[in-house]
């Protein structure tokens, strides 16, 4: 691997003498390495070198074009803000295609990350980071960006796929999941609200991150201020509620998304409030009334959509999501359905919190 990484470093014209690398274990899609070099002045510097998974991302050049457009727009608009910097090859490309390998290199940013937290300061700063990310891109020409994963948050199509999985019952699991099917089918129109409003033009298209887990924000190690939003592979046109709803779905559940303790699943309103405060602080005045009015409901939409996807995969024999045991996807689906029920019970409170945060 050393020789391969040396070759990549040379192609991206990185300064200094190659010292070695560390494999970065966080992240399950791309292979990531922290490469260390010694500069002419004797100091050491680090870079992140990634081998992009071209099975997961079938249009990696389009993906990198999206990232280039977004990072350059942020850099031009807010030069004082930290942004991801991707290095260029001699022919000014931000990627290197070497046989079947698709490489890219970015600066390493010393920082802290969090997989989960209930700290309101960190949550508020995470919300602020994702809200600011969207705010910085409100005036970008969205038509320049490609849809790297077509229909990623098209909830109607996700339901269509579940309908097919139910008809096929490919591995004979249908008899186990009738209560889950009944709930999701009853919730179909409510779950598809964002998709339907987007298709009708009632919600504007935005540049969205589409993977708004809290661990995709880098934080200052001393102050816990947010530094930069990372993992831009899924940046593409979408709806504002996609990012807000998925962030809340992931961060504001009392338990992990694959916990079997369904009685403990629920929306943590303290976490929800902290994240909403940060998100709306940076974005509230730029939102349309429809966006604001559907922000709380977006959490239900994104949670139900994922429940549909988990159940779909379970009925097809666990072909998409990585599982650790035979019923893993069913447990995930039941967990997300329990979270949907909790959100339904607290939707009036969630709406009130959103509108209160928007007024500050």
Language model segments and positions:
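Juxta-kinase regulatory segment immediately upstream of eukaryotic protein kinase catalytic domains
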Residues: 1-22
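Conserved ATP-binding subdomain of kinase catalytic cores across diverse folds
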Residues: 21-24, 28-38, 45-47, 52-160, ...
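ATP-dependent phospho-/nucleotidyl transfer catalytic cores
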Residues: 22-26, 50, 58-61, 112-124, ...
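Short, mixed charged/polar active-site loops
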Residues: 43-46, 227
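Catalytic activation segment of kinase domains across protein kinase-like and atypical kinase folds
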Residues: 201, 215-254
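Active-site activation/catalytic loop segments of kinase-like enzymes and analogous catalytic loops
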Residues: 237, 241-285, 301-320
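All-alpha amphipathic helical-bundle segments outside canonical DNA-binding/catalytic cores
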Residues: 287-299
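Long, compositionally biased intrinsically disordered regions
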Residues: 343-346
């Amino acid at each position: 691997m050393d020789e391969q990484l040396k070759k990549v470093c040379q192609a991206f014209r990185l300064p200094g003498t190659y010292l070695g690398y560390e494999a970065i274990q966080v992240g399950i899609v791309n292979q990531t390495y922290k490469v260390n070099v010694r500069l002419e002045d004797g100091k050491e510097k680090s870079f992140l070198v990634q081998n992009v998974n071209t099975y997961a991302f079938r249009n990696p050049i389009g993906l990198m074009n999206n990232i280039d457009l977004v990072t350059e727009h942020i850099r031009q608009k807010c030069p004082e803000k930290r942004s991801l910097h991707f290095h260029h090859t001699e022919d000014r490309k931000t990627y290197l295609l070497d046989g079947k390998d698709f490489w890219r290199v970015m600066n390493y940013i010393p920082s802290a990350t969090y997989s989960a937290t209930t700290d309101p300061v960190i949550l508020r700063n995470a919300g602020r980071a994702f809200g600011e990310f969207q705010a910085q891109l409100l005036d970008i020409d969205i038509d320049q960006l490609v849809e790297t994963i077509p229909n990623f948050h098209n909830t109607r199509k996700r339901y269509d796929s579940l309908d097919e999985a139910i008809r096929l019952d490919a591995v004979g699991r249908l008899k186990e999941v009738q209560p889950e099917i009944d709930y999701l089918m009853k919730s179909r129109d409510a779950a598809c609200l964002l998709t339907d409003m987007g298709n009708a033009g009632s919600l504007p298209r935005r540049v969205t991150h589409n993977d708004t887990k809290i661990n995709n924000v880098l934080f200052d190690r001393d102050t816990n201020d947010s530094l930069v939003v990372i993992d831009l592979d899924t940046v593409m046109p979408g709806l504002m509620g996609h990012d807000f709803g998925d962030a809340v779905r992931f961060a504001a559940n009392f338990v992990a998304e694959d916990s079997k303790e369904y009685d403990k699943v629920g929306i943590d309103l303290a976490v929800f409030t902290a994240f909403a405060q940060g998100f709306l602080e940076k974005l509230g005045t730029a939102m349309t009334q429809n966006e604001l009015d559907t922000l709380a409901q977006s959490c239900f939409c994104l949670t139900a959509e994922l429940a549909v996807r988990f159940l779909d995969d379970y009925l097809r024999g666990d072909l998409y999501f990585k599982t650790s045991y035979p019923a893993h996807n069913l447990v995930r689906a039941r967990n997300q359905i329990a979270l949907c029920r909790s959100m339904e019970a607290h939707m009036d409170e969630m709406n009130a919190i959103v509108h209160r945060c928007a007024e500050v």
